[in-house]
């Protein structure tokens, strides 16, 4: 049985690591040990920031919705509350896009939200509102 030497696989691994470290500064781009540490760390940051990215986008959508809704005299929280009470289920990404690209449709949603809030203030319960809407 032939002896297995691992030079080929080691070389391939090293090459893969150095390729991933391309563009790094200093020794990190051309020595295996430093490059491996830098690449491992960069993967940790990438993993973490994929989660953070979702949070950042949600915050951006909420800021945009809040800015658009304030033009109609509501706050973000009251607007979302009104949408929930009116039974309108639209996610924040879509609301944000509507506020930017389709202001008329967004205005209709704001009016529906206001109507739901005003009706519930007068009527008192959500069940009465839902039966009145249907």
UniProtKB/Swiss-Prot annotation:
Record's keyword terms, sorted: Ribonucleoprotein, Ribosomal protein, RNA-binding, rRNA-binding
GO BP: ribosomal large subunit assembly; translation
One Pfam family, short name: Ribosomal_L20
Cellular component aspect of the GO annotation: ribonucleoprotein complex; ribosome
Record-level Gene Ontology MF annotations: rRNA binding; structural constituent of ribosome
Role this protein plays: Binds directly to 23S ribosomal RNA and is necessary for the in vitro assembly process of the 50S ribosomal subunit. It is not involved in the protein synthesizing functions of that subunit.
Protein family: Belongs to the bacterial ribosomal protein bL20 family.
Protein name stated in the entry: Large ribosomal subunit protein bL20
Organism: Sinorhizobium medicae (strain WSM419) (Ensifer medicae)
């Amino acid at each position: 049985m032939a002896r297995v030497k691992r030079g080929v696989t080691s070389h391939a691994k090293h090459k893969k690591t150095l390729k991933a470290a391309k563009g790094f500064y200093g020794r990190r781009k051309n020595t295996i040990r430093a490059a491996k540490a830098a690449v491992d760390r960069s993967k940790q940051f990438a993993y973490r920031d994929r989660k953070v990215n979702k949070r950042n986008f949600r915050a951006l959508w909420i800021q945009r919705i809040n800015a658009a809704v304030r033009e109609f005299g509501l706050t973000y929280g009251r607007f979302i509350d009104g949408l929930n009470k009116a039974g309108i289920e639209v996610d924040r990404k879509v609301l944000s896009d509507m506020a930017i690209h389709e202001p008329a449709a967004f205005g209709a949603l704001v009016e529906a939200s206001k109507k739901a809030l005003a009706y519930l203030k007068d009527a008192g319960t959500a069940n009465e509102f839902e039966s009145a809407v249907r």
